[in-house]
UniProtKB/Swiss-Prot annotation:
ATP-grasp domain sequence ranges: 9-236
One GO CC annotation: succinate-CoA ligase complex
GO biological process: succinyl-CoA metabolic process; tricarboxylic acid cycle
Cofactor binding note from Swiss-Prot or TrEMBL: Binds 1 Mg(2+) ion per subunit.
Residues given in the record as Mg(2+) binding sites: N191, D205
Broad EC category: ligase
The protein's role, per its UniProt record: Succinyl-CoA synthetase functions in the citric acid cycle (TCA), coupling the hydrolysis of succinyl-CoA to the synthesis of either ATP or GTP and thus represents the only step of substrate-level phosphorylation in the TCA. The beta subunit provides nucleotide specificity of the enzyme and binds the substrate succinate, while the binding sites for coenzyme A and phosphate are found in the alpha subunit.
UniProt subunit comment: Heterotetramer of two alpha and two beta subunits.
Name of the protein described by the UniProt record: Succinate--CoA ligase [ADP-forming] subunit beta
Length: 392
């Protein structure tokens, strides 16, 4: 889960990392009220989960409340890299002497953690890496030892914090590491971490990615959920306990096990080349041991996508029994018909493995509209691509 800037700063403050005072506004009047309370110059910043806000006009300085309201009016509703702005952060402006970059992240190549930093903050780190890679400091972190005062001091020195703020930099680095560990994050980034004219260090912007697999340890994470920022189908699937990712094609794909589903995506895309570039519309893994209820929920999610022109259900029965999958398909159709929904999307079903014969018999007996059974994966992919192309 990626956090908005204001949410990231909330976590920073909880772990002792200094931030500027600020509040979130959803309309210009709220922005003006916040600016009055803060007093002085403020910055009005679009809250979207992407970079490039400044270049897109999503960050504006305001000298007073009226200017803050005008800035909020200009920013709210704009689209930045495909993300609509629904709220802004109004925060105190500061005079900057220097900008730094600091981050902790998962280093997948080493199967451990990594500290990164640079004295060239304030721009996207990818740009620094491309133009001046030697300006980026990388310090591996032993997962069993973490970041103590000695290592934090080494990182601060490598980045190049001056003596006047070195101790504060060490304290902030340890606070960010604490946030990284305590919150089960895969990324904690401050860009920029600024040194002010009076030698204070402040996190002016922040990015945090939380590991969704650790949600069970953090029941309070629900407060970070933002329905306006989530794909409604992905949110619906997550609520049903399904692993669903929306893609940009026309063929809905349902399978059991991530490996099989990914292979199915490849086979569908390959077959789709013959039919004008037909592609998968989603990844949906119903998991091992899926019940009829889970299958029904998955099919309901996929059929709710208006981009889907055909659906491929590809199941190799192991722990997941094929007859349970078949009952789920029947249940999904019954529920949709009972709700008055028209089922005009064809389904291609390939069942193999545990209780496949029983599953195929259940589907044959149900005589569901527009459901075809196919024996092999390749034939199923070709047929679903053909049907999707015909329905374009």
């Amino acid at each position: 889960m990626d956090l908005f800037e204001y949410q990231a700063k909330e976590l920073f403050a909880a772990h002792g990392v200094p931030i500027t005072p600020g509040e979130v506004a959803e309309n210009p009047d709220q922005a003006a009220d916040i600016a009055r309370r803060l007093g002085g110059r403020v910055v009005v910043k679009a809250q979207v989960k992407t970079g490039g806000r400044g270049k897109a006009g999503g960050v504006k300085l305001a000298d007073d409340a009226d200017a803050a309201a005008a800035a909020a009016e200009a920013i709210l509703g704009m689209e930045i890299r495909g993300h609509r702005v629904h709220r802004v952060l109004v925060t105190t402006a500061v005079d900057i002497a220097h900008e730094y970059y600091v981050a902790f992240l998962v280093d997948r190549s080493r199967r451990s953690f990594l500290a990164m930093g640079s004295a060239e903050g304030g721009v996207e780190i990818e740009q620094v890496a491309a133009e001046n890679p030697q300006a980026i400091v990388r310090v591996p972190i032993d997962a069993t030892e973490g970041v103590d005062a000695t290592l934090a001091a080494r990182i601060a020195d490598d980045i190049g914090f001056p003596a006047a703020v070195r101790d504060e930099a060490v304290r902030i680095l340890r606070g960010l590491w604490e946030a990284f560990q305590a919150e089960d994050a895969s990324l904690v980034e401050v860009n920029p971490l600024v040194r002010t004219l009076d030698d204070r260090l402040i996190a002016l912007d922040g990015k945090v990615t939380l590991d969704d697999n650790a949600d069970f340890r953090h029941p309070d994470r629900a407060r970070f959920a933002d329905p306006s920022a989530a794909d409604p189908l992905e949110a619906k699937a997550k609520a049903a306990g399904l692993h669903y990712v929306k893609l940009d094609g026309e063929v809905g794909v349902i399978g059991n096990g991530a490996g099989l589903v990914m292979s199915t995506l490849d086979v569908v895309a390959y077959a789709g080349e013959t039919y004008g570039g037909i592609r998968p519309a989603n990844f949906l893994d119903i998991g091992g041991g899926a019940s009829a209820e889970v299958m029904a929920a998955g099919l309901t999610v996929v059929l709710a996508d208006p981009a889907v022109r055909a659906v491929l259900v590809n199941v190799f029965g192991g722990i997941t029994a094929c007859d349970a999958v078949a009952r789920g398909i029947v249940a999904a159709f019954e529920n949709l018909i009972a709700a008055g929904e028209r089922i005009d999307v064809p389904l291609v079903v390939r069942l193999d493995g545990n209780r496949a014969a029983e599953g195929r018999a259940i589907l044959a007996a149900a005589q569901l509209p527009r459901v075809e059974q196919v024996e092999t994966m390749d034939d199923a992919a070709r047929r679903v691509a053909e049907l999707a192309a015909a329905a374009r």
